Amino acid sequence: MANHDPISDMLTRIRNASEKRHESTKVPASRMSRSIAKVLQQEGFIAEISEQGEGVRTELVLGLKYSGKHRQPTIRSMQRVSKPGLRIYKNTRGLPKVLGGLGVAIISTSKGVMSDRDARKQGVGGEVLCYVY
């Protein structure tokens, strides 16, 4: 079956694995999924990124992070914002602050995929892919 929204699929896989306290999860590799994973790692939501497989079947293995003795997931919520049927674009001034700055909005800009903080620093807007907190 064809996957019509690979970003939503990636976010759902991470969310489900995190709720079940898995050590890692696999997502199909693409340039966009690599970029999103890199932003999540830079912001401290995932521990590590590695690749497994070859060619079309390449997958990203994302190591998930937990905190405290009860292993609470670092990722509490992931919400897809811009969807294939309704794209959401924001300029620099319109970029959202997730949870008053405690969360991260992942933005696809002309300079690549980055967090909302980086987009504000560079003075660029773009498509708001998702919120993570």
Swiss-Prot record:
Enumerate the Gene Ontology biological process terms. translation
A Pfam family reported for this protein in Swiss-Prot or TrEMBL: Ribosomal_S8
Give the keywords, sorted. Ribonucleoprotein, Ribosomal protein, RNA-binding, rRNA-binding
The record's listing under PROSITE patterns reads:
RIBOSOMAL_S8 (PS00053)
Cited InterPro entries: Ribosomal_uS8, Ribosomal_uS8_CS, Ribosomal_uS8_sf
Picking any one GO molecular function of the record gives: rRNA binding
Q: Indicate yes or no for the key word RNA-binding.
A: yes
The reply on keyword RNA-binding is yes
Q: Which Gene3D superfamilies match?
A: 3.30.1370.30, 3.30.1490.10
Naming one, the record's GO cellular component terms include:
ribosome
Where is the sequence biased in composition, kind Basic and acidic residues?
16-25
Which segments carry the region annotation Disordered?
A: 1-32
Q: Which HAMAP family match?
A: Ribosomal_uS8_B (MF_01302_B)
Family the UniProt entry places it in: Belongs to the universal ribosomal protein uS8 family.
Quaternary structure note: Part of the 30S ribosomal subunit. Contacts proteins S5 and S12.
Q: What does this protein do?
A: One of the primary rRNA binding proteins, it binds directly to 16S rRNA central domain where it helps coordinate assembly of the platform of the 30S subunit.
- Protein name from the UniProt record: Small ribosomal subunit protein uS8
Q: Which organism is it from?
A: Synechococcus sp. (strain CC9311)
Q: What is the lineage of its organism?
A: Bacteria, Bacillati, Cyanobacteriota, Cyanophyceae, Synechococcales
